[in-house]
Amino acid sequence: MFLLHEYDIFWTFLIIASLIPILAFWISGILAPVSEGPEKLSSYESGIEPMGGAWLQFRIRYYMFALVFVVFDVETVFLYPWAMSFDVLGVSVFIEAFIFVLILVVGLVYAWRKGALEWS
């Protein structure tokens, strides 16, 4: 009726893929020596003791640039498969992709006008 047996390999893969990290953490928790002390709790970077606090504040501009980059990176991920199969999909999918790009361009213009892309 529903041919659920065709998904057996998927469920097997999913179970094995879930068990491997669980077993890895479990085995390392059992076999790893437990040593707590001040050296274990101190900050460490490249073999050198840090000079000063470990917490730094970053300007919000870095986050805005990263956010705009991620949006257009995801756009590329969505548009590449569409471009590779454009001849099969037809005109309706072209219109949908055009609307998708138009929405992203509107967002880019909004970010530009708000000054999110200004570095100084």
Swiss-Prot record:
The chain crosses the membrane at residues 9-29, 64-84, 88-108. One of its GO terms (cellular component) is NADH dehydrogenase complex. It is found in: Plastid, Chloroplast thylakoid membrane. It is an enzyme of class 7 (translocase). GO terms for molecular function: NADH dehydrogenase (ubiquinone) activity; quinone binding. It catalyses: a plastoquinone + NADH + (n+1) H(+)(in) = a plastoquinol + NAD(+) + n H(+)(out); a plastoquinone + NADPH + (n+1) H(+)(in) = a plastoquinol + NADP(+) + n H(+)(out). Keywords: Chloroplast, Membrane, NAD, NADP, Plastid, Plastoquinone, Quinone, Thylakoid, Translocase, Transmembrane, Transmembrane helix, Transport. NDH is composed of at least 16 different subunits, 5 of which are encoded in the nucleus. This is NAD(P)H-quinone oxidoreductase subunit 3, chloroplastic. It comes from Agrostis stolonifera.
